[in-house]
């Protein structure tokens, strides 16, 4: 059975369910069930050292002609990856506190009672955070990453691997290490009602986080592992200055979680702090028609539109798309006169901020 399973798993990674069934005459046959709503389609069968796309035709299986295989791939790609279903992941895998926080306090809209499963599933399907499958409602990739309590259970690549090194190269003797995982967004204090009727206080960047998500945890890791210099100004005021502008660091982290290629499994985002620089490395090349030159100019394009939309609601992402030129490039120039490196290298994208 294991050998058979290995012969039908596509290299992209589907996970057939193995079982058995008793038929007439007391014979037992092996049953292999392929998930109908897997992330990576079409399925392939192994023939020798090659993988062959096959389709069902009535009660038989046949090889798909090149044109049909191309059509199957095209149909799979039409749906953005962050809107695809995650088999096995459901409503119970979400942090209900964050969901209420998002719809009630961030979006300022009514939401179902916490125990109203059907109401929540319908709302989340309507907002693409869940997907209706053939047999059940499942989380979308974006829904799991944004609000999932343990996204790595289903998506091993859902996290940030952070390390702080004493020198300018990677070292086994790191000063600090942390695997950062959980929901991308923080849990924020509920919005307060204004003293003036019909004028609620809207969610903003100044809203207080009461439980950090991945983005804030990553920024906290940076704060703990860089220095802050303090001095007394001529007018007697205490002045402070971090090694790096935190707004630029935050923008680099947000861009990584919003735009990385989540189809590349297992590989986390890398956040590395060296003696002379900070590096944020995102798996995957730049999305769509984006180039480094276009990024510097503020070109707007996204690989994970659902994730970006929700992060924009939380004010993590600028609606103008000018986060890179304004916060990273201009921010580093103003801070220490350095020019940040934006590098597309093989199957990864690197943002490098220099200490100066």
Predicted regions and their residues:
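Short C-terminal beta-strand
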Residues: 347-355
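Active-site helix-to-loop segments that bind/position phosphate- or nucleotide-bearing substrates
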Residues: 54-266, 289, 293-300, 315, ...
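Divalent-cation
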Residues: 1-51, 56-59
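Conserved glycine-centered short motifs in functionally critical loops
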Residues: 265-291, 298-310, 314, 322, ...
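A short glycine-rich, hydrophobically flanked beta-strand micro-motif that places a catalytic Asp/Glu
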Residues: 16-19, 255, 264-272
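Glycine-rich ATP-binding loops of the HATPase_c
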Residues: 318, 337-343
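Short, surface-exposed charged micro-motifs
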Residues: 20, 161, 268-270, 339-341
């Amino acid at each position: 059975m294991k050998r058979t399973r290995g012969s039908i798993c596509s290299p992209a990674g589907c996970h057939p369910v193995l079982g058995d069934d008793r038929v007439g005459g007391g014979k037992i046959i092996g049953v292999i069930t392929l998930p109908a709503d897997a992330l990576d389609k079409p399925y392939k069968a192994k023939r020798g050292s090659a993988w062959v796309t096959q389709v069902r035709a009535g009660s038989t299986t046949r090889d798909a002609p090149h044109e049909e295989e191309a059509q199957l791939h095209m149909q799979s790609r039409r749906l953005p990856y962050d809107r695809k279903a995650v088999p096995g992941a459901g409503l119970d895998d979400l942090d209900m506190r964050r969901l209420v926080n998002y719809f009630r306090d961030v979006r300022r809209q009514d939401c179902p009672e916490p125990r109203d499963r059907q109401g929540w599933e319908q709302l989340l399907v309507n907002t693409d955070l869940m997907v209706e499958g053939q047999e059940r409602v499942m989380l979308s990739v974006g829904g799991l990453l944004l609000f999932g309590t343990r996204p790595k259970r289903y998506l091993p690549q859902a996290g940030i691997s952070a390390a702080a090194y004493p020198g300018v190269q990677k070292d086994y003797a790191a000063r600090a290490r942390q695997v950062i995982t959980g929901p991308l967004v923080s849990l924020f204090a509920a919005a307060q009602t204004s003293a003036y009727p019909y004028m609620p206080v809207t969610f903003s960047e100044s809203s207080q986080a009461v439980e950090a998500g991945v983005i804030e945890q990553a920024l906290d890791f940076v704060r703990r592992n860089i220095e802050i210099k303090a001095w007394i100004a001529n007018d007697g005021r205490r002045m402070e200055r971090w090694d790096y502008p935190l707004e630029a660091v935050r923008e680099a982290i947000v861009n990584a979680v919003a735009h990385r290629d989540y189809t590349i499994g297992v590989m986390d985002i890398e956040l590395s702090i060296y003696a002379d620089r900070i590096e944020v490395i995102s798996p995957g090349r730049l999305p769509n028609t984006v180039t480094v030159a276009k990024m510097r100019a503020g070109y707007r394009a996204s690989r994970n539109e659902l994730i970006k939309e929700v992060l924009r609601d939380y004010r993590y992402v600028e609606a103008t798309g000018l986060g890179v030129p304004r916060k990273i490039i201009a921010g580093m120039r103003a801070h220490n006169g350095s020019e940040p490196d934006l590098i597309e290298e093989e199957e990864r994208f690197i943002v490098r901020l220099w200490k100066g």
